[in-house]
């Protein structure tokens, strides 16, 4: 069981922190919440964003067997882009947010359902 959850968690961690590392170049920040995330993962994400002056607030979270099953959150990038979303977390949904800092971005900010 541990082997099955370690890879998705490792991938998510690398994906999230990899995306966060682009903020110094002002490119793209993308976060997708998934059923493998724990409270500790979410608190770590919140801290990393705060270190970059991005405020992520968890209004409500539910966990099933210590894994994320519901999230109600707000995000504020401090540059006029902010939003909220709440949803059950499932494999068929991609809930989260994307902030694209590129000048020619087709959609500079998305929050909520990322499958479009």
What are these regions (language model features)?
Residues 1-26:
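Bacterial Sec-dependent N-terminal signal peptides
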């Amino acid at each position: 069981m541990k082997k099955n959850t370690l890879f998705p968690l490792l991938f998510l961690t690398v994906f999230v922190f990899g995306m966060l590392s682009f903020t110094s170049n002002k490119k793209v920040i993308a976060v997708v919440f998934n059923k493998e995330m724990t409270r500790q993962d979410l608190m770590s994400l919140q801290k990393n964003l705060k270190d970059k002056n991005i405020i992520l607030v968890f209004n409500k979270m539910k966990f099933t067997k210590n894994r994320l099953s519901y999230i109600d959150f707000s995000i504020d990038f401090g540059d006029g882009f902010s939003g909220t979303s709440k949803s059950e977390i499932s494999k068929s949904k991609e809930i989260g947010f994307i902030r694209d800092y590129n000048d020619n971005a087709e959609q500079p900010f998305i929050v909520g359902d990322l499958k479009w």
